[in-house]
Swiss-Prot record:
(6S)-5,6,7,8-tetrahydrofolate binds at residues 133, 137-139, 366-368. The keyword Amino-acid biosynthesis applies. GO terms for cellular component: cytosol. Its cofactor is pyridoxal 5'-phosphate. The keyword Membrane does not apply. This is Serine hydroxymethyltransferase. Belongs to the SHMT family. It is found in: Cytoplasm.
Length: 433
């Protein structure tokens, strides 16, 4: 005879009440260690930022429990009236933020937002143009290892060897030769402004859509510290983290009603099923934050700080690709120092300064080694770093890398330890969480 097992109230209470440290101490420990890293390292990865406590609360909310296939007012599940509020707020706020007519806030990432544009506007085998990954573009802009380069015919444009700037005459010549259906402006490591008006004129001349991927500089656009892709672009995508300082995710914007309809169908049901409503709620919070006056000050300071970091590094004898930066990021070419990006990233990491190895224009080193590093100002600016702090950061970077060049990895421990002590002291003046 089988004993009857009843689910008792104490067990249910335990499920809903147990905190993470009790329920899963291993994950809790990993989070604790990561918090310590974020608190005590100077974060210079250009694609990273630090979100507000409010964004964290929204993303960790009970909105994660709700399935909501479809769009506000047109869901395939019941009980969506409150998640509809969150998504409608996200749409309303992001439209206001970028002064555009239509927005889809459901993409789970910038890559999926870009895929939605391809699905909406292209057919397999169609030709499109984007910045070469080796010149600062992005995987999703036609890299042969990415879906965009496998399903479509990608024609890449590059930068001039003389100044590492995009040669718009060369872009125009390529467009006239290949007759693309779509032209992309945007990248992951291009430190200068984009000539949106010229790109649109070139696109119009060959009957192409003009698509801007502003994942890296969206927050700067929102804060009035970078030219807007509107009214030039037919369609715009972005991530919601990076300079926009929200949760990890994507979005698509347009002023064209027909394109908006195609984008909505491409996102759902074309690419995704149920949207992540807890993330969309967090996006709404971040968009609301970005509409406030203090975000404009933040965006402007991001640009000032990046310029300060770049100019100080030049003073210290480092080569900066294109000679500087107009936005939040820069590429440091380490070939004159006879260093690799891989070695520099590791040395700076040991000194409590986080960055990423990155190829530089016309790099001959492998992507796993590289001849440069990419640096960005958004996260440290969120902490409160100003121009003086970024001058200090540049000095710490120079001291570490000059020591590495002189002493080698095995002989640079004392320099790295000294820099680490000062880097941690700097972070402690600007605490997070």
């Amino acid at each position: 005879m089988n004993a009857k097992v009843e689910v008792g109230q104490p067990a249910a209470n335990s499920f809903f009440a147990a905190n993470l440290a009790d329920a899963d101490p291993e994950i809790a420990k990993a989070i604790e260690l990561e918090l310590g890293r974020q608190r005590h390292e100077i974060e210079l990865i250009a694609s990273e930022n630090i979100v507000s406590k409010a964004v964290l609360e929204a993303q960790g909310s009970i909105m994660t429990n709700k399935y909501a296939e479809g769009y506000p007012g047109k869901r395939y599940y019941g009980g969506c009236q409150f998640v509809d509020i969150a998504e409608n707020l996200a749409i309303e706020r992001v439209r206001k933020l970028f002064d555009c007519q239509f927005a889809n806030v459901q993409p789970n990432s910038g890559s999926q937002a870009n895929q939605a544009v391809f699905l909406a506007l292209l057919q397999p085998g169609d030709v499109f143009m984007g910045l070469d990954l080796a010149a600062g573009g992005h995987l999703t802009h036609g890299s042969p290892v990415n879906l965009s380069g496998k399903w479509f015919k990608a024609v890449s444009y590059g930068v001039r060897q003389s100044d590492h700037l995009i040669d718009m005459d060369a872009v125009e010549a390529l467009a006239k030769e290949h007759k693309p259906k779509l032209i992309i402006a945007g990248g992951s490591a291009y430190p200068r402004h984009w000539d949106f008006a010229r790109f649109r004129a070139i696109a119009d001349s060959v009957g192409a859509y003009f698509f801007v991927d502003m994942a890296h500089f969206a927050g700067l656009v929102a804060g009035g510290a970078h030219p807007s892709p509107f009214p030039h672009a037919h369609v715009v995508t972005s991530t919601t983290h990076k300079t926009l300082r929200g949760p990890r995710g994507g979005l698509v914007l347009t002023n064209d009603a027909d394109i908006a309809k195609k984008i909505n169908s491409a996102v759902f049901p074309g690419l995704q099923g149920g949207p992540l409503m807890h993330v969309i709620a967090a996006k709404a919070v971040a968009f609301g934050e970005a509409l406030r006056p203090d975000f404009r000050l933040y965006a402007q300071q991001v640009v000032v700080n990046a310029g300060t970091l770049a100019s100080r590094l030049v003073e210290k004898g480092f080569a900066i690709s294109s000679g500087g930066t107009d936005n939040h990021l820069m590429l440091v070419d380490l070939r004159p120092k006879q260093l690799t990006g891989k070695a520099a990233e590791a040395a700076l990491g040991r000194a409590s300064i986080t960055c990423n190895k990155n190829g530089v224009p016309f790099d001959t080193a492998s992507p796993f080694v590289t001849s440069g590093i990419r640096l960005g100002s958004p996260a440290a600016t969120s902490r409160g770093f100003g121009t003086k702090e970024f001058q200090d950061v540049a000095d710490l970077i120079a001291e570490t890398l000059d020591g590495l060049a002189k002493n080698g990895e095995e002989g640079n421990a004392a320099v790295e330890a000294s820099v680490k002590e000062r880097a941690i002291a700097l972070t402690q003046r600007f605490p997070i969480y």
